């Protein structure tokens, strides 16, 4: 039976790569390397769009977004924080051609889909100790969605710091805290309220969505509501908090 052209090409590529590995140090090694690279190209934009719109990709995207929105809703409902803004960026990247040197791993997959989500809240700066402690109390009752609780020693010291019961939580001279962080968990940041001058850390505005950033299913960028800013939350409530989720690689197709 006559082999199809694709089968012949795949076999010739395998043979060429095997020869290349043996001859890499020979004078013809570089030429063979360049020829082999042509056998393993990056994922085309057409293929990226097709895979991004597949049933499996759509399901994975909906599940990842739903899980993070559920966590945000729990923070809004059970902590002293008031939700004001949610930003989401959803991007699909095609894999690269074979990386023979300085490999990054981007040549191992056809497509990788990643989601970036941050929620912004408002709170009263005059009651920040109660706010931090209220978050920990909510985490005691619902650790699956609010990972900070009273078992987190540093977080309890932060609450005591704002009550004036202890010094700088990270040690003498380290100054006012502005973050709670646990590996693989969302990171909580807030405006510093005791620090004045140029050294004061404030929650930054999210990056705007460029016009070209909305091209479903390949790219999505959302600001909900679009008219709200961090500075507006600060004016309304007195201070701002942000809850930033780790980058979620929710759909990957390997080569």
Predicted regions and their residues:
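Sec-dependent bacterial lipoprotein signal peptides
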Residues: 1-37
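Context-gated lysine
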Residues: 3, 9, 17, 46, ...
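Residue-level detector of functional hotspots within protein domains
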Residues: 25, 99, 103, 227-229
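An acidic-aromatic pocket/loop used at catalytic or ligand-binding sites
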Residues: 39-88, 142-255
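Short, solvent-exposed beta-alpha or beta-beta edge segments that form flexible loop/patches at the rim
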Residues: 83-105
């Amino acid at each position: 039976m006559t082999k199809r052209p694709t089968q012949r090409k795949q076999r010739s590529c395998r043979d060429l790569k095997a020869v290349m590995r043996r001859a890499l140090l020979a004078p013809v090694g570089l030429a063979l390397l360049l020829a082999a690279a042509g056998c393993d190209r990056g994922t085309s934009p057409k293929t990226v769009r097709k895979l991004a719109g597949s049933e499996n990709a759509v399901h994975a995207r909906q599940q990842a977004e739903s899980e993070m929105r559920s966590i945000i809703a729990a923070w809004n409902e059970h902590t002293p924080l008031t939700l004001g803004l949610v930003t989401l960026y959803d991007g699909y990247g095609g894999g690269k051609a074979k990386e023979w040197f300085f490999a990054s791993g981007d040549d191992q997959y056809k497509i990788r889909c990643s989601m970036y989500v941050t929620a912004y809240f408002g709170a009263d700066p005059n009651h920040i100790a109660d706010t931090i402690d209220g978050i920990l109390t909510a985490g005691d009752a619902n650790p699956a969605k609010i990972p900070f609780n009273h078992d987190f020693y540093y977080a309890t010291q932060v609450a005591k710091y704002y009550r004036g019961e202890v010094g700088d939580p990270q040690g003498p001279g380290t100054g006012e805290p502005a973050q709670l962080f646990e590996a693989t968990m969302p990171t909580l940041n807030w405006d510093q309220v005791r620090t004045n001058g140029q050294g004061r850390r404030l929650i930054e505005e999210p990056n705007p969505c460029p016009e070209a950033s909305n091209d479903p299913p390949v790219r999505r960028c959302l600001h909900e509501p679009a008219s709200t800013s961090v500075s507006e939350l600060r004016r309304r409530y007195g201070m701002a908090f942000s809850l930033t989720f780790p980058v979620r690689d929710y759909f990957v197709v390997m080569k």
